[in-house]
Amino acid sequence: MTAATPATTTPARPPHTIRMHVRDNVAIVANDGGLPAGTVLPSGLVLRDKVPQGHKVALVDLPADGPVLRYGIPIGYVMQAIPAGSWVHERLLHMP
């Protein structure tokens, strides 16, 4: 018996994310309609969740109480650990 590997998805258009600053640990999904779970980003990161257009995706594992960096500065703090490839939405953050 072999372990199942997660299914990956290739959207009709190549996945496009925007990382505003080199220190950022999240990127913004720019594809019209967002990206489905399983999408492989150019970096090789696989999305764990469907991420709507204009929303953030974790580029690395984000530890509980750690900062979410956008534009190189904290925009919020993680309430519980968020794995890389996950949708980072406001319900998961303490806002400054």
Q: Which positions does each model-derived feature cover?
A:
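Well-ordered secondary-structure scaffolds
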Residues: 1-96
